Swiss-Prot record:
Component of the ClpX-ClpP complex. Forms a hexameric ring that, in the presence of ATP, binds to fourteen ClpP subunits assembled into a disk-like structure with a central cavity, resembling the structure of eukaryotic proteasomes. ATP-dependent specificity component of the Clp protease. It directs the protease to specific substrates. Can perform chaperone functions in the absence of ClpP. This is ATP-dependent Clp protease ATP-binding subunit ClpX. ATP binds at residues 118-125. It comes from the Bacteria.
């Protein structure tokens, strides 16, 4: 036949229609073909869209002053630490956006953060609130549970698993999350001198954390626990995960004061020597002091930003009880209002709660348990007693375990009596 095809028809790109002879390469799929030119064009379109998204993310990212303002709504005091965190977090996420759009090859290094302050000063809460403001996945880990590979305890990769779980196993979201490692001071070296015994929960853990702090592709066991060769692993890039480590670092102030050649405040101070202000050691804290405390230089090098937190005063604790958006007093008022009961705390009660938290050396962390204990009997009774109108917590309820004052609604007339068990 005259019109019989004697040669195989030349393959054409399914997108632009160009035959194979006019392009360098054609990739075949299931009945579909794409040429190298269309691949390059598609890549450019995707890159441009990613660049536009990254620019939008940078514009939408709260500025340091905005972050600080939002932190002020939830966290009382600690202005210095909040400023340091606001700037550091802003620069961190701006850096991530820059990585997506910058073609100059200029690399901005990651800056992890160390929070140093006494127990109950708000270290964990600050990190939690930051993640909430930025709407990123967040995970908390306890450094004291970690051991280096090969020993009984948790692998450092399990920290990443917690973040992945909190991101609903969305790896991309997890890779832009925040991880807070508490009690980091507890994995300091036992002594400056090298020991012949293995420090599996101290320097060894610091060494194990180095890579994930700096940025690496970590293999995470999906079910947690120890890794074994036959197990399927999840790969997580830690390059853009912000790590915040925190600890009380008891005794670090003495290291700073000794370095400055100053004596401790109080009766031990000799005449003629410079007195040390309460916050002087915080202003003069250096990475060298942390090395002296027991953190290895390589570890400190990966946490260049240090923010110190002050010990909370009684006035601070009273403000924490009443002022933030989710203040404890507001929370318990809301709880009892669901049973149509008004809750009030007298000024004396608030003062007593704050004093008790300080005497227990728990700071803000101890407030909830004190308030919870004072309200236990009330919260037990009110759901079953429709006649209760108002509950007042006084100083004696906190300090002497007295009964709260309860106002009843009785035939539209109010009658106040002491609650009975």
């Amino acid at each position: 036949m005259a019109n019989e095809i004697t040669e195989q028809e030349e393959v054409k790109c399914s997108f632009c229609g160009k035959p194979q002879s006019q392009v360098k390469k054609i990739v075949a799929g299931n009945g579909v073909y794409i040429c190298n030119e269309c691949i390059d064009l598609s890549k450019k379109i995707i890159d441009d869209e990613l660049k536009a998204d990254s620019i939008k993310e940078t514009k939408d990212l709260p500025k340091p002053m905005e972050i600080k303002k939002q932190l002020d709504e939830y966290v009382i005091g600690q202005d210095r630490a909040k400023k340091v965190l606001s700037v550091a977090v802003y620069n961190h996420y701006k850096r991530i956006s820059q990585m997506d759009i910058d073609s100059t090859g200029t690399e901005l290094q990651k800056s992890n953060i160390a929070l140093i302050g006494p127990t109950g000063s708000g270290k964990t809460y600050l990190a939690q609130t930051l993640a909430k403001i930025l709407n990123v996945p967040f995970a908390i880990a306890d450094a004291t549970t970690l051991t280096e590979a090969g020993y009984v305890g948790e692998d450092v990769e399990n920290i990443l698993l917690k973040l992945l779980q909190n991101a609903d196993y969305d790896i991309e979201r997890a890779q832009r999350g925040i991880i807070y490692i508490d009690e980091i001071d507890k994995i300091s070296k036992k002594a400056e001198n090298v020991s012949i015994t293995r420090d599996v929960s101290g320097e060894g853990v610091q060494q194990s954390l180095l890579k994930i702090l700096e940025g690496t592709i970590a293999s995470v066991p999906p079910q947690g626990g120890r890794k074994h060769p036959q197990q399927q692993m999840i790969k997580i890039d830690t390059t853009n995960i912000l790590f915040i480590v925190g600890g009380a670092f008891d005794g670090i102030e003495n290291i700073v004061k000794n370095r400055l050649g100053k004596k401790t405040i109080g009766f031990g101070a000799e005449n003629g020597l410079n007195q040390v202000d309460a916050d002087d050691w915080q202003k003069n804290l250096t990475t060298g002091d942390l090395v002296k405390f027991g953190l290895i230089p390589e570890f400190i090098g990966r946490i260049p930003i240090i923010a110190t937190l002050d010990k909370l005063s009684t006035e601070d604790l009273i403000r924490i009880l009443t002022e933030p958006k989710n203040a404890l007093v507001k929370q318990y008022k809301k709880l009892l209002s669901l049973d149509d009961v008004d809750l009030e705390f007298t000024d004396g009660a608030l003062q007593a709660i704050a004093d008790m938290a300080i005497s227990r050396r728990m700071g803000a962390r101890g407030l909830r348990s004190i308030v919870e204990n004072s309200l236990m009997d009330v919260m037990y009774r009110t759901p079953s007693d429709d006649n209760i109108k108002e509950v007042q917590i006084t100083k004696d309820v906190i300090t002497k375990h007295a009964e709260p004052k309860i106002t009843y609604k009785e035939d539209k007339a109010e009658k106040t009596s002491e609650a009975t068990k």
